[in-house]
UniProtKB/Swiss-Prot annotation:
The encoding gene: tatC1
Extra remark beyond the main annotation: B.subtilis possesses two minimal, substrate-specific, Tat translocases: TatAd-TatCd and TatAy-TatCy, each one composed of a TatA and a TatC protein. TatA is bifunctional and performs the function of both the TatA and TatB proteins of Gram-negative organisms.
Subcellular location per the Swiss-Prot or TrEMBL entry: Cell membrane
Membrane-spanning segments: 19-39, 60-80, 107-127, 150-170, 188-208, 209-229
Function as written in the Swiss-Prot or TrEMBL entry: Part of the twin-arginine translocation (Tat) system that transports large folded proteins containing a characteristic twin-arginine motif in their signal peptide across membranes. Required for PhoD secretion. TatCd promotes membrane localization of TatAd via domain specific interactions. TatCd is required for stabile production of TatAd as well as for its maintenance.
One GO CC term on file: TAT protein transport complex
Gene Ontology molecular function terms on file: proton motive force dependent protein transmembrane transporter activity
Induction of the gene: Expressed under conditions of phosphate starvation.
Reported phenotype of the disruption mutant: Depletion of TatCd results in a drastic reduction of TatAd.
Region (Interaction with TatAd): 128-149, 171-187
Keyword hit for Membrane: yes
UniProt name for this protein: Sec-independent protein translocase protein TatCd
Organism: Bacillus subtilis (strain 168)
InterPro entries for the chain: Sec-indep_translocase_CS, TatC
Entry's Gene Ontology BP terms: intracellular protein transmembrane transport; protein transport by the Tat complex
Amino acid sequence: MDKKETHLIGHLEELRRRIIVTLAAFFLFLITAFLFVQDIYDWLIRDLDGKLAVLGPSEILWVYMMLSGICAIAASIPVAAYQLWRFVAPALTKTERKVTLMYIPGLFALFLAGISFGYFVLFPIVLSFLTHLSSGHFETMFTADRYFRFMVNLSLPFGFLFEMPLVVMFLTRLGILNPYRLAKARKLSYFLLIVVSILITPPDFISDFLVMIPLLVLFEVSVTLSAFVYKKRMREETAAAA
């Protein structure tokens, strides 16, 4: 076995170890969340007038596992980000390592901010609008599975989408992206974000519109922040070359 193959095996072993640590953290958070899942459930349905219905015993377990899984994913993000950083850190320069480490806490904060926006802002508005449509015409009954799927579909994607500005800033700082590339890709980006907004919302124009606007705003914020970071990086490179 030559030196190159030994080096590759070492990298794969390190990657395997980082993945195992991340998965172990996820399952630990999953078990912890499941122990408190009834309290989480009660908190999430605190504003409902009645109880949610279930169509079978297995649906109860499915709902509890879904709620526990979402909590575990949220709690595992800092662990996954840190393990990824530890894996790529040896290949980075001292400046790149410093920049990368600075962005990890921000990823978790923006993920929570995105979920909070989806849950506290979008979800009540869309739910109220849709239930208002049935007022006086239909007997509304929510099943636990449908209710929480609807909640997750509106909230969880925003957890990841809210990270877009920070990811763009990070890639701009490393020289992979710049505001000019983002501006050229604006039409394509708008199209993709509109498709995402349609996929994660119920099939009505109001819901699509309410989700579409924040996504487009996030993209424009990303372009603006990219321009700020790009100018700062250019000034630093000019000063270093002088």
